[in-house]
């Protein structure tokens, strides 16, 4: 089983960008934690971080042939990207939406997700720990044959 983990805009700055909101862990720290979880679960992972919306869309299309599911922190594109929503829907890959912060406890514009309706689940507000949670949840979902 293979899971892709996609990270959107500004997530390359984790560890230094607003640590009071996003925590002190870097993206490399998060990837290491995910790899540990994946090894325990016996699954392979690949990672992508991009600040470009089109690159995320392309990544979903490529993942259709290489991955069993996707964990995505789409960052700000969560709230704006119909293109990303359409890519998730078109590829039919089981996808978990993830956010480090509780977006519903923040600014009103962060309360709506364009992608949540086409994702199998949502994890938010647990900081860096949300990533291993999302990987674990997606693997469990896939092992259950995509049952809710």
From Swiss-Prot:
* Residues of the site described as Transition state stabilizer: 17
* Keyword Transmembrane helix appears in the UniProt entry: no
Domain of life of the organism encoding this protein: Bacteria
What would you give as a GO molecular function for this chain, any one? 3-dehydroquinate dehydratase activity
Q: Which family does it belong to?
A: Belongs to the type-II 3-dehydroquinase family.
Q: How does it assemble?
A: Homododecamer.
State what protein this is by name: 3-dehydroquinate dehydratase
**Species name:** Jannaschia sp. (strain CCS1)
Identify the taxonomic lineage of the organism of origin.
Bacteria, Pseudomonadati, Pseudomonadota, Alphaproteobacteria, Rhodobacterales
């Amino acid at each position: 089983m293979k899971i892709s983990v996609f990270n959107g805009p500004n997530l390359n700055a984790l560890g230094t960008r607003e640590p009071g909101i996003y925590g002190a862990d870097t993206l490399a720290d998060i990837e290491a934690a995910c790899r540990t979880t994946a090894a325990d679960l016996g699954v392979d992972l690949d990672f992508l971080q991009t600040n470009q919306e089109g690159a995320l869309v392309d990544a979903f299309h490529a993942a259709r042939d290489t991955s069993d599911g996707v964990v995505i922190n789409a960052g700000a594109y969560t709230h704006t990207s119909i293109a990303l929503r359409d890519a998730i829907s078109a590829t039919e890959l089981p996808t978990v939406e993830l956010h480090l912060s509780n977006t519903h406890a923040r600014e009103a514009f962060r309360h709506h997700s364009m992608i949540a309706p086409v994702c199998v689940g949502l994890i938010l507000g647990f900081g860096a720990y949300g990533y291993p949670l999302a990987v674990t949840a997606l693997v469990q979902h896939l092992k259950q044959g995509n049952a809710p």
